[in-house]
């Protein structure tokens, strides 16, 4: 069911830059450290307060999901561009996340690698989890956020692996938060992200099984 769980986003990763790992840096919040005299402690406190407000504002912005900007569906897509790379393609493949630098038709699965300005995400191809529109869109939104974050980075398999790894961690978080669950009807069921968590009701155990306290003999 590749067609059911795929998303294609436009990317601005650079094909011109050399494959240099040093060019890819995680986004960090810039902070200014100021050394002041004891008489200037009040100035430092004001700066710390302003920095805290900026960080809180940044956290609020991070909580807002990135709007989806899927590529418009194309017609009559044909597989092409593979010969230019000797039958290989730029990709990052993990258990639940497959990312390709190409446009993949969601219905016919035709693979057009000549459109390397697009990244296609195939989500959970083995259907290990149960997905609905909301949970799928959360993953797609996070994927879109990562694509935007790496704008200007070299288009290499290393960059795609960074994105894929972050998406895998995000899926794990969704599982632990109870936003998705294992598909018990999956063809292969091995709980790759840990066994399901089961909550027990201990009230019956403490009360002797019927919810009433036991009387002493």
Curated annotation (Swiss-Prot):
Its EC number is 7.1.1.-. The keyword Membrane applies. One of its GO terms (cellular component) is plasma membrane. It catalyses: a plastoquinone + NADH + (n+1) H(+)(in) = a plastoquinol + NAD(+) + n H(+)(out); a plastoquinone + NADPH + (n+1) H(+)(in) = a plastoquinol + NADP(+) + n H(+)(out). Disruption phenotype: Malfunction of the NDH complex. GO terms for biological process: NADH dehydrogenase complex (plastoquinone) assembly. InterPro entries: NdhM (IPR018922). Belongs to the NDH complex subunit M family. This is NAD(P)H-quinone oxidoreductase subunit M, chloroplastic. It comes from Arabidopsis thaliana (Mouse-ear cress).
């Amino acid at each position: 069911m590749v067609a059911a769980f795929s998303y294609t986003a436009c990317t601005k990763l650079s094909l011109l830059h050399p494959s240099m790992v040093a060019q890819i840096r995680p986004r960090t919040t810039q902070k200014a450290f100021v050394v002041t005299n004891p008489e200037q402690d009040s100035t430092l406190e004001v700066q710390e307060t302003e920095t805290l407000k900026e960080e809180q504002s940044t956290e609020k912005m991070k909580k807002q999901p990135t709007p989806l900007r899927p590529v418009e569906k194309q017609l009559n897509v044909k597989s092409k561009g593979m010969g230019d790379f000797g039958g290989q393609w730029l990709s990052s493949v993990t258990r639940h996340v497959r990312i390709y630098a190409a446009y993949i038709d969601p219905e016919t699965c035709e693979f057009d690698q000549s459109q390397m300005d697009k990244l296609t995400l195939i989500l959970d191809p083995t259907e290990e989890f149960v997905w609905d529109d909301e949970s799928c869109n959360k993953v797609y939104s996070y994927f879109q956020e990562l694509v935007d974050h790496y704008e200007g980075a070299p288009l290499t398999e290393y960059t795609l692996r960074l994105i894929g790894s972050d998406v895998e961690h995000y899926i794990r978080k969704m599982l632990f938060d109870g936003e998705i669950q294992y598909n018990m009807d999956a063809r292969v069921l091995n709980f790759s992200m840990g066994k399901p968590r089961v909550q027990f009701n201990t009230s019956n155990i403490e009360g002797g099984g019927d919810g009433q306290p036991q009387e002493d003999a």
